Swiss-Prot record:
Keyword Ribosomal protein: yes
HAMAP family tied to this protein: Ribosomal_bL35
GO molecular-function terms, A-Z: structural constituent of ribosome
PANTHER family: 54S RIBOSOMAL PROTEIN BL35M, LARGE RIBOSOMAL SUBUNIT PROTEIN BL35M
InterPro entries to which the protein is assigned, alphabetical: Ribosomal_bL35 (IPR001706), Ribosomal_bL35-like (IPR021137), Ribosomal_bL35_CS (IPR018265), Ribosomal_bL35_sf (IPR037229)
Protein name: Large ribosomal subunit protein bL35
Ranges annotated as biased composition (Basic residues): 28-40
Length: 66
């Protein structure tokens, strides 16, 4: 059986924790940050854990990181 390929776009955007959760950077922080509060800008710096319904889809594209 041939090896399965990992999607390059998913490989660059997401990482898997030791417990199997999918971790990514926060979205919606490219432009228009002047009208947001300082707290929301500060929160956007960190990473986010995806919920289980979305992480199932991402795990399909990363076959060897389970």
């Amino acid at each position: 059986m041939p090896k399965l390929k990992t999607k390059s776009s998913v490989k660059k955007r997401f990482s898997v924790t030791a417990t199997g959760k999918i971790k990514s950077t926060q979205s919606a922080k490219r432009h228009g940050m002047t009208k947001r509060s300082k707290r929301s800008i500060r929160v956007q710096r960190g990473t986010a854990i995806m919920n289980s319904s979305d992480s199932r889809i991402v795990k399909l594209f990363m076959p060897y990181s389970r």
